[in-house]
Amino acid sequence: PLEYTNEEYALAKISGLKMCESYNLQYGTNYIAVMPTNLYGPNDNFHLENSHVMPAMMRKIYLAKLINEDNWQAIRTDLNKRPVEGVDGTAQEQRILEVLSKYGIADNAVQLWGTGKPLREFLWSEDMADASVHVLLNVDFSDIIGIEKYSSVFYGAETNGQNDRNSNAGRGGAIPALGEIRNCHINVGTGKEITIKQLAQLIAQAVDFKGDIQFDSTKPDGTPRKLTDVTKLNNLGWKHKVEIDDGVAKLFAWYQNDLKA
Protein backbone atom coordinates (compact mmCIF):
# COMPACT_ATOMS: atom_id res chain seq x y z
CA PRO A 1 0.00 0.00 0.00
CA LEU A 2 1.04 3.60 -0.54
CA GLU A 3 2.30 5.57 2.46
CA TYR A 4 -0.64 7.70 3.57
CA THR A 5 1.10 11.07 3.94
CA ASN A 6 2.66 10.70 0.48
CA GLU A 7 -0.24 9.05 -1.36
CA GLU A 8 -1.25 11.86 -3.75
CA TYR A 9 2.33 12.53 -4.82
CA ALA A 10 2.94 8.81 -5.36
CA LEU A 11 -0.22 8.40 -7.44
CA ALA A 12 0.78 11.28 -9.70
CA LYS A 13 4.16 9.68 -10.35
CA ILE A 14 2.70 6.23 -10.93
CA SER A 15 0.17 7.65 -13.39
CA GLY A 16 2.97 9.12 -15.50
CA LEU A 17 4.88 5.84 -15.53
CA LYS A 18 1.82 3.83 -16.49
CA MET A 19 0.90 6.30 -19.24
CA CYS A 20 4.30 5.82 -20.90
CA GLU A 21 4.01 2.05 -20.54
CA SER A 22 0.47 1.96 -21.96
CA TYR A 23 1.28 4.12 -24.99
CA ASN A 24 4.25 1.89 -25.79
CA LEU A 25 2.27 -1.32 -25.51
CA GLN A 26 -0.66 -0.03 -27.51
CA TYR A 27 0.98 2.04 -30.22
CA GLY A 28 4.59 0.85 -30.31
CA THR A 29 6.01 4.17 -29.14
CA ASN A 30 9.39 4.33 -27.44
CA TYR A 31 8.79 6.34 -24.26
CA ILE A 32 11.26 5.55 -21.49
CA ALA A 33 10.19 6.47 -17.95
CA VAL A 34 12.84 6.90 -15.28
CA MET A 35 12.08 7.03 -11.56
CA PRO A 36 14.74 8.87 -9.52
CA THR A 37 15.38 8.39 -5.84
CA ASN A 38 15.94 11.39 -3.53
CA LEU A 39 18.21 13.88 -5.28
CA TYR A 40 20.70 16.37 -3.84
CA GLY A 41 23.36 18.59 -5.34
CA PRO A 42 24.22 22.07 -6.65
CA ASN A 43 21.37 24.61 -6.62
CA ASP A 44 19.40 22.55 -4.12
CA ASN A 45 16.69 24.20 -2.05
CA PHE A 46 18.09 25.32 1.31
CA HIS A 47 15.09 27.40 2.40
CA LEU A 48 14.10 26.12 5.83
CA GLU A 49 10.37 26.54 5.19
CA ASN A 50 10.18 24.10 2.28
CA SER A 51 13.54 22.46 1.61
CA HIS A 52 14.40 18.80 1.19
CA VAL A 53 15.78 16.78 4.07
CA MET A 54 19.51 16.96 3.29
CA PRO A 55 19.89 20.69 2.51
CA ALA A 56 17.62 21.59 5.43
CA MET A 57 19.66 19.47 7.80
CA MET A 58 22.92 20.89 6.45
CA ARG A 59 21.86 24.49 6.85
CA LYS A 60 20.54 23.92 10.36
CA ILE A 61 23.79 22.32 11.48
CA TYR A 62 25.84 25.06 9.83
CA LEU A 63 23.86 27.85 11.49
CA ALA A 64 24.05 26.15 14.90
CA LYS A 65 27.81 26.08 14.53
CA LEU A 66 27.93 29.77 13.57
CA ILE A 67 25.82 30.72 16.59
CA ASN A 68 28.23 28.87 18.87
CA GLU A 69 31.17 30.64 17.25
CA ASP A 70 29.39 34.00 17.65
CA ASN A 71 30.03 34.52 13.93
CA TRP A 72 27.29 37.03 13.27
CA GLN A 73 28.78 38.23 10.02
CA ALA A 74 28.42 34.73 8.53
CA ILE A 75 24.93 34.32 10.02
CA ARG A 76 23.79 37.58 8.47
CA THR A 77 25.31 36.65 5.13
CA ASP A 78 23.40 33.37 5.22
CA LEU A 79 20.09 35.03 6.07
CA ASN A 80 20.55 37.76 3.48
CA LYS A 81 20.92 35.03 0.86
CA ARG A 82 17.96 32.98 2.13
CA PRO A 83 15.71 34.80 4.63
CA VAL A 84 13.71 32.69 7.09
CA GLU A 85 10.06 33.75 7.44
CA GLY A 86 11.00 37.17 6.12
CA VAL A 87 13.83 37.60 8.64
CA ASP A 88 17.09 38.49 6.90
CA GLY A 89 20.54 39.52 8.03
CA THR A 90 19.50 43.07 8.86
CA ALA A 91 17.35 41.93 11.80
CA GLN A 92 18.38 42.24 15.44
CA GLU A 93 20.32 39.31 16.90
CA GLN A 94 17.50 38.35 19.25
CA ARG A 95 14.97 38.27 16.41
CA ILE A 96 17.26 36.07 14.35
CA LEU A 97 17.76 33.66 17.25
CA GLU A 98 14.01 33.51 17.82
CA VAL A 99 13.15 32.57 14.25
CA LEU A 100 15.98 30.03 14.02
CA SER A 101 14.85 28.39 17.25
CA LYS A 102 11.49 27.66 15.60
CA TYR A 103 13.41 25.37 13.25
CA GLY A 104 15.36 23.62 15.99
CA ILE A 105 18.53 25.69 15.59
CA ALA A 106 20.30 26.81 18.76
CA ASP A 107 23.77 27.46 20.15
CA ASN A 108 25.78 24.35 19.16
CA ALA A 109 22.60 22.24 19.10
CA VAL A 110 20.15 21.11 16.44
CA GLN A 111 16.80 19.38 16.86
CA LEU A 112 15.57 17.28 13.94
CA TRP A 113 12.19 15.67 13.34
CA GLY A 114 11.53 12.01 14.05
CA THR A 115 13.61 9.23 15.53
CA GLY A 116 16.46 9.31 13.03
CA LYS A 117 15.78 5.66 12.18
CA PRO A 118 14.10 5.90 8.74
CA LEU A 119 16.25 4.71 5.86
CA ARG A 120 16.75 6.87 2.80
CA GLU A 121 18.65 6.65 -0.46
CA PHE A 122 20.29 9.72 -2.01
CA LEU A 123 21.66 10.36 -5.51
CA TRP A 124 23.91 13.22 -6.58
CA SER A 125 21.91 15.33 -9.05
CA GLU A 126 24.63 15.35 -11.69
CA ASP A 127 24.63 11.55 -11.59
CA MET A 128 20.90 11.73 -12.30
CA ALA A 129 21.55 13.92 -15.32
CA ASP A 130 24.23 11.50 -16.52
CA ALA A 131 21.88 8.53 -16.12
CA SER A 132 19.15 10.32 -18.07
CA VAL A 133 21.50 11.02 -20.98
CA HIS A 134 22.71 7.41 -20.91
CA VAL A 135 19.15 6.10 -21.11
CA LEU A 136 18.23 8.60 -23.83
CA LEU A 137 21.13 7.59 -26.05
CA ASN A 138 21.41 3.88 -25.34
CA VAL A 139 18.10 2.38 -24.22
CA ASP A 140 14.93 1.47 -26.12
CA PHE A 141 11.70 0.12 -24.66
CA SER A 142 12.43 -3.21 -26.33
CA ASP A 143 15.68 -3.43 -24.31
CA ILE A 144 13.69 -3.11 -21.10
CA ILE A 145 11.07 -5.77 -21.83
CA GLY A 146 13.22 -8.04 -24.01
CA ILE A 147 10.68 -8.10 -26.86
CA GLU A 148 11.36 -6.45 -30.21
CA LYS A 149 7.74 -6.12 -31.39
CA TYR A 150 5.36 -5.30 -28.58
CA SER A 151 2.46 -3.07 -29.65
CA SER A 152 -1.10 -4.37 -29.71
CA VAL A 153 -1.56 -2.60 -33.04
CA PHE A 154 1.32 -4.63 -34.49
CA TYR A 155 -0.35 -7.82 -33.28
CA GLY A 156 -3.56 -6.97 -35.14
CA ALA A 157 -5.61 -4.92 -32.70
CA GLU A 158 -7.71 -2.10 -34.06
CA THR A 159 -6.97 1.28 -32.54
CA ASN A 160 -10.69 2.00 -32.53
CA GLY A 161 -11.75 -1.52 -31.59
CA GLN A 162 -14.71 -2.04 -29.30
CA ASN A 163 -13.61 -5.31 -27.74
CA ASP A 164 -12.05 -5.84 -24.34
CA ARG A 165 -8.48 -4.53 -24.03
CA ASN A 166 -7.25 -8.06 -23.26
CA SER A 167 -8.48 -9.35 -26.60
CA ASN A 168 -6.21 -9.47 -29.63
CA ALA A 169 -9.05 -7.81 -31.48
CA GLY A 170 -9.35 -5.08 -28.91
CA ARG A 171 -7.63 -1.75 -28.72
CA GLY A 172 -5.79 -1.99 -25.41
CA GLY A 173 -2.13 -2.36 -24.58
CA ALA A 174 -2.34 -5.90 -23.19
CA ILE A 175 -1.35 -8.71 -25.56
CA PRO A 176 -2.28 -12.16 -24.20
CA ALA A 177 0.31 -13.93 -26.33
CA LEU A 178 3.09 -11.94 -24.67
CA GLY A 179 1.88 -12.41 -21.12
CA GLU A 180 1.88 -9.61 -18.56
CA ILE A 181 4.22 -6.71 -19.25
CA ARG A 182 4.51 -4.26 -16.39
CA ASN A 183 6.96 -2.32 -14.23
CA CYS A 184 8.71 -1.04 -17.36
CA HIS A 185 10.16 2.08 -15.75
CA ILE A 186 13.83 2.38 -14.83
CA ASN A 187 14.79 3.20 -11.25
CA VAL A 188 17.69 5.65 -10.97
CA GLY A 189 19.60 5.57 -7.71
CA THR A 190 22.54 4.08 -5.88
CA GLY A 191 20.84 1.03 -4.42
CA LYS A 192 22.37 2.02 -1.06
CA GLU A 193 20.57 3.38 1.99
CA ILE A 194 21.47 5.35 5.09
CA THR A 195 19.53 6.25 8.23
CA ILE A 196 18.59 9.86 8.84
CA LYS A 197 20.76 9.77 11.96
CA GLN A 198 23.76 8.55 9.96
CA LEU A 199 23.13 11.29 7.41
CA ALA A 200 23.11 13.91 10.17
CA GLN A 201 26.45 12.57 11.40
CA LEU A 202 27.92 12.74 7.89
CA ILE A 203 26.77 16.34 7.54
CA ALA A 204 28.16 17.25 10.97
CA GLN A 205 31.50 15.83 9.88
CA ALA A 206 31.49 17.85 6.64
CA VAL A 207 30.51 21.05 8.49
CA ASP A 208 32.95 20.32 11.35
CA PHE A 209 30.09 20.57 13.83
CA LYS A 210 30.93 19.29 17.32
CA GLY A 211 27.61 20.12 18.95
CA ASP A 212 24.53 18.16 19.92
CA ILE A 213 22.15 16.60 17.39
CA GLN A 214 18.80 15.72 18.94
CA PHE A 215 15.80 13.91 17.46
CA ASP A 216 12.23 14.80 18.39
CA SER A 217 10.39 11.46 18.35
CA THR A 218 7.04 13.23 18.80
CA LYS A 219 7.35 14.40 15.19
CA PRO A 220 6.60 12.04 12.27
CA ASP A 221 9.26 9.90 10.62
CA GLY A 222 7.47 9.51 7.30
CA THR A 223 7.98 6.36 5.24
CA PRO A 224 10.24 3.94 7.18
CA ARG A 225 12.27 2.95 4.14
CA LYS A 226 12.79 4.16 0.57
CA LEU A 227 15.23 2.09 -1.47
CA THR A 228 15.25 1.57 -5.23
CA ASP A 229 16.22 -1.62 -7.03
CA VAL A 230 18.74 -0.38 -9.60
CA THR A 231 19.54 -3.80 -11.09
CA LYS A 232 17.77 -2.93 -14.35
CA LEU A 233 19.75 0.27 -14.87
CA ASN A 234 23.04 -1.36 -13.91
CA ASN A 235 22.37 -4.12 -16.45
CA LEU A 236 21.71 -1.43 -19.06
CA GLY A 237 25.23 -0.12 -18.53
CA TRP A 238 25.01 2.69 -15.98
CA LYS A 239 26.11 3.01 -12.35
CA HIS A 240 26.35 6.03 -10.06
CA LYS A 241 29.72 7.71 -9.51
CA VAL A 242 29.33 9.90 -6.40
CA GLU A 243 29.05 8.12 -3.04
CA ILE A 244 27.08 9.75 -0.24
CA ASP A 245 30.06 10.79 1.92
CA ASP A 246 31.77 12.54 -0.99
CA GLY A 247 28.47 14.02 -2.10
CA VAL A 248 27.71 15.56 1.29
CA ALA A 249 31.15 17.21 1.34
CA LYS A 250 30.66 18.47 -2.23
CA LEU A 251 27.24 19.89 -1.38
CA PHE A 252 28.54 21.80 1.64
CA ALA A 253 31.42 23.19 -0.44
CA TRP A 254 28.89 24.35 -3.03
CA TYR A 255 26.75 25.96 -0.31
CA GLN A 256 29.69 27.90 1.10
CA ASN A 257 30.73 29.12 -2.35
CA ASP A 258 27.16 30.13 -3.12
CA LEU A 259 27.08 32.32 -0.01
CA LYS A 260 30.11 34.18 -1.36
CA ALA A 261 28.52 34.79 -4.76
Task: Report residues per predicted region.
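C-terminal substrate-binding subdomain of Rossmann-fold SDR/epimerase-dehydratase oxidoreductases
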Residues: 63-261
